[in-house]
């Protein structure tokens, strides 16, 4: 498994030769023995984010029982422990670890 890229292509998940070339060059720089290796597969996905760059964490108004924890853009893995703790605290009615207001979908997400 070698790295990741970021391309602003809307909802197009097509892989590109440019991205593959960049990833391969980075891998060879770190481990020259990979120079003759050929990729087995290439994959592309989406990195959904919010317009403000702040994830949506909390209940979605108008949809009883629907809670969100999304919109982390490229920081999903890094923020997962804290955002899941916040969501868990909110769901269970416990005092949250941080102020949940900035993350609330209320007033920020319109369905």
What do the PLM-derived regions correspond to, one by one?
Residues 1-63:
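Active-site lid/adjacent beta-loop-alpha segment flanking the redox-cofactor pocket in flavoenzymes
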Residues 60-111:
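C-terminal lid/capping helical subdomain adjacent to the catalytic/cofactor pocket in oxidative enzymes
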């Amino acid at each position: 498994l070698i790295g990741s890229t970021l391309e602003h292509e809307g909802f197009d998940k097509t892989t590109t030769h440019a991205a593959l070339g960049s990833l391969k060059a980075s891998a060879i720089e770190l481990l020259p023995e990979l120079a003759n290796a050929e990729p087995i597969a290439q994959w592309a996905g989406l990195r959904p984010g919010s317009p403000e760059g702040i994830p949506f964490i909390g209940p979605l108004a108008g949809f009883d029982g629907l809670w969100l924890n999304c919109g982390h853009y490229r920081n999903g893995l890094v923020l997962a422990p804290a955002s899941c703790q916040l969501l868990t605290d909110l769901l269970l009615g416990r005092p949250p670890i941080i102020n949940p207001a900035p993350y609330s979908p209320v007033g920020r997400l319109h369905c």
